[in-house]
Amino acid sequence: MNGVLLRHQQPGGLGRAPRKPMPRGASRLVAKEPLSVRLPKADFSFLKYLAWPLLLAVLGYGAYRGAEYILPYADRPIAKVSVEGDLSYISQRAVQQRISPYLAASFFTIDLAGMRGQLEQMPWIAHAEVRRVWPDQVVIRLDEQLPIARWGDEALLNNQGQAFTPKELANYEHLPRLHGPQRAQQQVMQQYQLLSQLLRPLGFSIARLEMSDRGGWALTTAQGVEIQIGRDHVVDKIRRFVSIYDKALKDQISNIARIDLRYPNGLAVAWREPVTPATVATASAVQ
């Protein structure tokens, strides 16, 4: 009897890979993350930088549209012009003629700067202020020039030494006449005011004051006395003259034609008429 070889076959048949043994003991299940956690979050922090500009833009647009609506009702024609200030040399009518071209505009569109410029071009106006007063008024404040002296034959000087030229210049021949280089108007006015103050206690007023191109000073009093001062120590020389005048010249003033202060320690006197012996003695005392 032929022998037969029997082989033990694993269940599952031929050609199958052996199964891995199952792990023994307990196993842990890992829960899956929610979709909202796994997806990247949107960053909206940039919106806070846009909030204020956006708000301002909205407010600005609202104000603009509101103004467009209100302006036709608020922007009225100019109904009244008031002029303030003490006016001695210019008239209300002259002011009205100057500003009349501007009054056709409305309350908000009137050119205040242009109106002020036109007013300050008038020779007698030193300074002008123009402002609106709700709802339909313009108020003008004017400061007139204060003429102190004549500047040669061509202009007047105010108290700041600023020249101005009114049409009626011939009406001010009574004012003292100042002369000097054009660049020295303010300096000459300051010197005039100072010397006038020093001479006033003697009863003298200045009719003419001149500054030469080299800086020398000379004046003529209203009494007709010429005083040569020179360039240096002007105030000291005038004070010396005041002191000597009270002591030796007061009684002879009507006979004095010219006084020369261009000496370091004295003065020289030129007389109108031939001097008497007493006058000669006086003149010798002050030289």
From Swiss-Prot:
Its main location: membrane. This is Cell division protein FtsQ. GO terms for cellular component: cell division site; FtsQBL complex; plasma membrane. Residues 1-45 are cytoplasmic. Belongs to the FtsQ/DivIB family. FtsQ subfamily. Residues 76-145 form the POTRA domain. Essential cell division protein. May link together the upstream cell division proteins, which are predominantly cytoplasmic, with the downstream cell division proteins, which are predominantly periplasmic. May control correct divisome assembly.
